[in-house]
């Protein structure tokens, strides 16, 4: 059973820890979460150790995964399907979209099984349960920064060889946009994680669902390609990941279709998903040991 921890200091006995049941729909103690930041960082380290343990290439997969995926996109969608890339090198176009999408997908997939995979730990010792999903998105953030560095190296190569790519003022917004992507992934991930305590099918479906979600996002095609299909373009713009991907391309390639309305909608969706996720997480953590 999840509890809320508060500290008090009796006059003679020194510090003690008082654990009280949580109450309310939105009962998340951010101060307590910050106090356990060392534990969160320890979980981040554990995530890396578990993920690459007994692998031949180890952390090199952080770079190989998006690189191989980008090459496949370039061959299939660029060379074979002949999809436009808004006048920029196809390799950079696909890597830009894939870098942002991989960050989001990792945030969702890695937090989606928080309750199920950590049930034994949750049942033995008290700590803020939210440290688990937070550690997962921080792990994904580190992976993203490494992949973004690789993207920058390829960008410099193409720029040096005369490709028409450039950084724009949108670059200033990239840190905030990536924070939004991380929070959106956290929100969606903990929603799924909360529901999987009762509906295990979601744990299986989430990976497939994220893959389908990618094709509803402008990862392998430019949003401008849908100008002749207004209804389809509206549907794609309803995807909260459309704006972050387009902003990243606008920032680093000088292309992309970015509007203030799309950004506001994406941010609002992120806030709603995060609030809903935290509410569900707060409610489910009280009883999940009875269902997992």
Predicted ranges, named:
Residues 1-292:
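Hydrophobic transmembrane alpha-helices and immediately adjacent juxtamembrane helices
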């Amino acid at each position: 059973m999840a509890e809320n921890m508060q500290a008090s200091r009796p006059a003679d006995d020194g510090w003690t820890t008082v654990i009280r049941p949580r109450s309310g729909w939105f009962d998340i103690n951010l101060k307590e979460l910050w106090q356990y930041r060392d534990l969160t960082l320890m979980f981040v380290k554990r995530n890396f150790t578990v993920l690459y343990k007994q692998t031949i290439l180890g952390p090199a997969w952080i770079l190989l995964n998006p690189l191989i995926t980008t090459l496949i996109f370039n061959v299939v969608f660029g060379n074979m399907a002949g999809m436009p890339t808004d006048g920029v090198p196809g390799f950079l176009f696909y890597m830009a979209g894939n870098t942002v999408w991989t960050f989001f997908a990792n945030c969702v997939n890695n937090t989606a099984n928080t309750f199920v995979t950590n049930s034994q730990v949750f049942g033995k010792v008290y700590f803020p349960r939210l440290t688990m999903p937070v550690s997962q998105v921080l792990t994904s953030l580190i992976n993203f920064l490494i992949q973004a560095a690789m993207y920058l190296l390829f960008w410099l190569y193409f720029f040096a060889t005369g490709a028409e790519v450039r950084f724009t003022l949108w670059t200033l917004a990239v840190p905030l946009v990536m924070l939004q992507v991380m929070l959106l992934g956290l929100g969606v991930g903990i929603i799924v994680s909360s529901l999987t305590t009762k509906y295990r099918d979601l744990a299986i479906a989430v990976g497939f669902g994220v893959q389908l979600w990618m094709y509803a996002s402008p990862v392998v095609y430019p949003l401008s390609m849908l100008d002749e299909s207004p209804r389809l373009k509206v549907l794609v713009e309803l995807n909260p990941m459309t704006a972050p991907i387009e902003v990243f391309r606008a920032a680093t390639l000088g292309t992309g279709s970015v509007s203030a309305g799309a950004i506001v909608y994406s941010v609002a969706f992120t806030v709603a998903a995060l609030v809903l996720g935290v509410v569900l997480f707060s409610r489910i953590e009280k009883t999940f040991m009875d269902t997992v």
